[in-house]
Structure formats: C-alpha cells, structure tokens
C-alpha cells in the first residue's frame, strides 16, 4: 500500500485542510496470506505540502514470523510552492525500510532519495484527479556489493475517481523506475489500484490489487487484498 492519499490530497490542498487514514488489508497473494497496515498523512501549508505513509506486514509465508512484524517500510515527501497559481511543484522524497526473509535474517530496503517535479490536474468538481511526477532517483549502496550508489529515474502517476455521488472511490498509483536487480533486470513496475465503498464519511470497505513486474522477482505478479479504511 502506498501513495493512496496523494490524489485526494490535492483536494485537501485546495481547501487547506489535512487528511489522514488508516488501512488494514488481508493479502491473498501466493506465498503471502498476511495482514498489512498502512498509515497515511497529508498536510498542506502556505509553502507546499508534506505527505508520508508507513506500511507494516504482519507475518507471511517464508518470513519465519508468525507473531509480529515481518516488514516495515515508509516514504515521506515534501512538495514546494511559492504562489497560489503554481502548476509545477518541485519535490523531494525519501524511502526506506527493512524486511525478514526467514531464519532470523533481516535485510534492509535501501535508503533511497528522490528529487523531481509534479503536476496535478482536476475536474471542475474535483471528482477526477490525476497527479504525474518525474523524479531523479538515488539508491544508496545498491551496486558492487553495497559499496556504490545507483542513479536512475522514477515516473509516478496517482489518481482518484469519485463515483455514485461519492459512495464509490477508485484510487491508486503506478510507479515505473530504473533499478538494477540481481536477477538481471533493470526496470521495475508497481501499481496498486484500490476500489472502496464509502459506508460513511469515515469508514470504507474495499481492497486493492497489487500489479507488479520485476518487483519481488523476475516475473509479473497479481496480488489481491480485502481491506478496511478509516479516514480521520
């Protein structure tokens, strides 16, 4: 789960309010069968906006962990503005975490720094929103046995579509980036479209489908979830 607040964040930005939500998903993906929690926050101010999320997995096949956290990962980003009519916003971002691979072994999700620019489009009633980002990406100690940083790029799209007078929300993101992997690929793709039925202003029932290529391994994978979401 990631970046799933960024699209609705534009609405929050327009009206200068913050937004937060908590999600809990059960993952049906092969070899997973686990719970994942996501905490997200978006907060605008007169100089731009701050966004972060924290993902945690609670056990999974192959991690050797049945009672506890098997993965922790977070991203934090800051976008900058200097006037109210600004269309393009410079941005910086940090990603990092750690995960269990079994037998008591934990490996880092390498520190990653991104810098780039973003642009958002919205319909007149803000029921349809699209944000596109283009970033330079630096992954620390990724190459040559952990002694050399890797430089690349990342392209991101984030969207939200409100349907049935706001009772149904289709949202998600797609990332495409360059990263050399030990299984021989250089490019990776990850998308997590979500569909939510908004039972009330705060509570939603739905889920997501994780679509990835060269993300966990040298393959295309589809991993569905069922989820609950509470928006503060």
What are these regions (language model features)?
Residues 21-27, 33, 60, 64-157, ...:
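Outer-membrane pore/translocation modules
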Residues 42-44, 77-81, 118-122, 158-162, ...:
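Transmembrane beta-barrel domains of outer membrane proteins
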Residues 221-232:
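Outer-membrane beta-barrel "beta-signal"
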Residues 135-203, 210-214, 230-232:
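Outer-membrane beta-barrel transmembrane domain signature
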Residues 4-15:
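Sec-dependent N-terminal signal peptides
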Residues 47-52, 83-90, 123-130, 161-170, ...:
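Repeated loop/turn-to-beta-strand initiation elements of outer-membrane beta-barrel proteins
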Residues 19-62:
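Short glycine/proline- and aromatic-enriched beta-strand/turn motifs that initiate or cap beta-hairpins
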